[in-house]
Amino acid sequence: MADFDAVLKFWGPVEADYDKIGNMVLTRLFTEHPDTQKLFPKFAGIGLGDMAGNAAISAHGATVLKKLAEVLKAKGNHAGIIKPLANSHATKHKIAINNFKLITEIIVKVMQEKAGLDAGGQTALRNVMGVFIADMDANYKELGFSG
């Protein structure tokens, strides 16, 4: 519970502008890990220079952060949130589990810059995401997806 609270303490600036922060997260993900852009067919033709102002990237980034907010606010009681998410990411989107590790580090960096996430908060976010990723992976295995 302490890790969830430590991250939520810094969540206000993220929640205040999901579109902007979400765009920053995905743009940085695609910039630092260009192969990840291929996982999003609807973003395939968007050049790096055009991402910052792209409404579709902002909207999807906001969706990612809103789902993370649900997980954070559930404070560990997130099975009902993760199961459908794992199902769609395994069966429809085919997203390998390692990509969640990549986006975790991007979210840590963006929250450090835009929400003042301190060292303790960064560790807490990595811990929360570690549990989330392990639970996603367990669901993937149940579905027979070795992402």
Curated annotation (Swiss-Prot):
* Catalytic activity field: Fe(III)-heme b-[protein] + nitric oxide + H2O = Fe(II)-heme b-[protein] + nitrite + 2 H(+); H2O2 + AH2 = A + 2 H2O
- Which residues are listed for heme b binding in this entry? H89
**Entry GO CC:** extracellular exosome; sarcoplasm
Can you tell me which residues bind nitrite?
Answer: H60
Q: Where in the cell is it found?
A: Cytoplasm, Sarcoplasm
Quaternary data? Monomeric.
Q: What is this protein called?
A: Myoglobin
Which species expresses this protein natively? Answer: Scomber japonicus (Chub mackerel)
